[in-house]
Amino acid sequence: NEDFISGAVALANQTGADIYHGKYADEPIEYARKAGNGDKFEIGKWTLEVIATPGHTKDSICVLAIDNEQDGQPIGVFTGDTLFVSEVGRTDFYPEEMEKMAGQLYDSLQTLANLGDDIIVYPAHGAGSVCGSGMAEREFTTIGIEKRQNPGYQCTSKKAFIERKLKENHYIAPYFSKMEQSNVTGMDTPLPPVACQKLAQDAQSAWQKSAERPGVLIDVRSHAQFRDCHYPGSLNLPGGLLSAYGGWFLDYSTPIALVADSHQQATESSEQLWRMGYQQISGYLTMVPKPDTIEAYHRQHVNAVTADKVDERIRAPRANWQLLDVRKQEEVENNEFDQAKHIYLGYLPEMCHQLDKSRHYTLACGSGKRATVAASYLLAQGFENVDVFIGSMQAWQSYQQGA
């Protein structure tokens, strides 16, 4: 697994359970045994049967849950990264074998389809995961629903499926390599040993001032709260965006502190970071003082602009203005903004040198959320004239329909 640290070792150490993985891993998994197609495990009234489902990786497996008290009927299947709700697994982790892996995934999906329409599907990821771009916001589904609605099942042939997969554009965050190695060797600490603590008063003072800040300050409050008032130089990564995009902006040697609404929010965010291997978390702040001067207001506030204003700027563009779209490539291909420059959000750290700090940038995405993340990063890098297209593509489409 490459997007977070597995809890398998910690769970095994606490319970004495054995750990198993598929037979064809790229490297030996030091803490686990191998399980192959057809292997069965008896747990109480349940039988768990391994189904080899290569494609996402060579050792991918699914696990069929059979209820022995219901005449040995299969009830559900844990599909890992093979089948999601409204999406199927990535096949790009082997660049030299992408066609082969896509073909294997097609075969694996047919194996799952043959289990029966009533089988409940429990995937490993949900909406917002880097492991697929079209996942629906539901925690489970059924084989029958996916056969009817999942784009991966709508391909008319194996050839068509392979062609579809080869056209996909996925992103591999820099931290993936550390996650892969951590999960090969095994880590016993997928969660922080204690809850995130509020910073002491003297430490708060240092973190509040951008010139004295000893690391990266991440604001995990809502986008609206960040735009209204934030600490200059902080990075806005609330909710699932922290795990989805934090790995593009953070390194493992730099301390991190959080700005949060509550102890619970700070703790949940620190747990996300810990699962990604970021363990230098100093603590959190809760209060963001309101600016007391016009100059401070401009440093702590991000303007939001609406679709009609963006339309006005597009129709009568100024030489120093640019609409900057930070969505994924496939989103841009499906619906483009007129006259926009495209830089994927995760690529901003390596590509922001292409941007001119003297220009005025309006950040856009699908809804305004990722645009706010991008704005926070550019402001932290010294860009001064930045605002956010509120609603972004959703608002743009509604505006055009109304117009």
Region spans (language model):
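Rhodanese-like catalytic fold shared by cysteine-dependent sulfurtransferases
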Residues: R90, I145-Q181, T185-M187, P192, ...
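Active-site neighborhood of phospho(di)ester-bond hydrolases with catalytic His/Asp-centered motifs
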Residues: N1, I19-Y24, A52-G55, V77-G80, ...
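Active-site flanking residues adjacent to catalytic metal/cofactor-binding acidic residues
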Residues: G80, S86, A124, I218, ...
